[in-house]
Amino acid sequence: MKLMTMPSEFQKALPILTKIKEAGYEAYFVGGSVRDVLLERPIHDVDIATSSYPEETKAIFNRTVDVGIEHGTVLVLENGGEYEITTFRTEDVYVDYRRPSQVSFVRSLEEDLKRRDFTVNALALDENGQVIDKFRGLIDLEQKRLRAVGKAEERFEEDALRIMRGFRFAASLDFDIEAATFEAMRSHSPLLEKISVERSFTEFDKLLMAPHWRKGISAMIACQAYDYLPGLKQQEAGLNHLIVSLKDNFTFSDHHQAWAYVMISLAIEDPKSFLKAWKTSNDFQRYVTKLIALYRIRQERSFEKLDIYQYGKEMASLVEGLRKAQSLSVDMDHIEALDQALAIHNKYDIVLNGSHLIKDFGMKPGPQLGLMLEKVELAIVEGRLDNDFTTIEAFVREELAT
């Protein structure tokens, strides 16, 4: 197969391939970018593989950076762009089902492609637009099928994260997993416990944000892979609820919304501990935990002005997005009106602060001062007090007198 026209991302990188070829080596576009071009999807990263060894690659170009030279990768700075160029390589026995014990550089494109996970990711493209397909990846692309390169059992024993990648690709590409590949994923799912939680989180997160995320979750359920992921053991019912409880065409707006609804579906009692088990950041934990709290408030009643002040319009909109997907009542205009009606959006908008209370009222730093500032803040938010210096002073004077 030959591409009639190269996408602009590849055209810009063609001089890189030409330079390598002129130096006497092979060079190709490889991996997901080739797959996405053939599927007419946007390209995110342009990866180049070459028969030149790292030191040989560095000798060809004036500006390079060693970004992963032990794995054969050199970053080339050329024509205003940055390109990762990786030497063809083979990988020795994998350690802990996660990483190869040794990487060996080779001159053969086929040897390089055969170590990849799925046939649709094992395609290469030369400078003339000719697709090199050593493992029937083009047929799999046409039939929307995800199939492991070579023996599926070996691929998942080498790196068990490929199981999670399989679920993610099913979700992002809307592909079905080939039977033998699926069976190997199912039988090797216990190996997911050997994988770092951070790597599993990244794949699961991408799955949730994919347009066909239900397909990925369904495959995970069928493989019983969830039993080997943090907080998901024996959660088949909750995961099924996740799939069926939202409208068919719904996709999550952002990562926080996705993980919040996962925990809502699973009826997780301690969201922060659940997210800690996934080794997420403290900021992520705080935001998602607040989002779940706001969702539960909204299930009981309509939003009030204080809700929008404390949680923010953006978070309230994420909650309404989930409610809409559940065919529940939503009122985005109400959220907007409440936000517009707020005299302040945070405590720093208040014209009077703690220093004024200390100076003008002789208050001392401590709990009493903090409590007074909270009273002022709440009164302004609820509309009982104008954000005006004189008015606030009168309010404080009255509070101190009681």
UniProtKB/Swiss-Prot annotation:
Its cofactor is Mg(2+). Mg(2+) binds at D45, D47. The keyword Magnesium applies. Keywords: ATP-binding, Magnesium, Metal-binding, Nucleotide-binding, Nucleotidyltransferase, RNA repair, RNA-binding, Transferase, tRNA processing. One of its GO terms (molecular function) is tRNA binding. It catalyses: a tRNA precursor + 2 CTP + ATP = a tRNA with a 3' CCA end + 3 diphosphate; a tRNA with a 3' CCA end + 2 CTP + ATP = a tRNA with a 3' CCACCA end + 3 diphosphate. SUPFAM superfamilies: Nucleotidyltransferase, Poly A polymerase C-terminal region-like. The keyword Transferase applies. Its EC number is 2.7.7.72. It comes from the Bacteria. It holds the Pfam family PolyA_pol_RNAbd. One of its GO terms (biological process) is tRNA 3'-terminal CCA addition. HAMAP family: CCA_bact_type3. Catalyzes the addition and repair of the essential 3'-terminal CCA sequence in tRNAs without using a nucleic acid template. Adds these three nucleotides in the order of C, C, and A to the tRNA nucleotide-73, using CTP and ATP as substrates and producing inorganic pyrophosphate. tRNA 3'-terminal CCA addition is required both for tRNA processing and repair. Also involved in tRNA surveillance by mediating tandem CCA addition to generate a CCACCA at the 3' terminus of unstable tRNAs. While stable tRNAs receive only 3'-terminal CCA, unstable tRNAs are marked with CCACCA and rapidly degraded. Homodimer. A single active site specifically recognizes both ATP and CTP and is responsible for their addition. This is CCA-adding enzyme. It comes from Streptococcus pyogenes serotype M3 (strain ATCC BAA-595 / MGAS315).
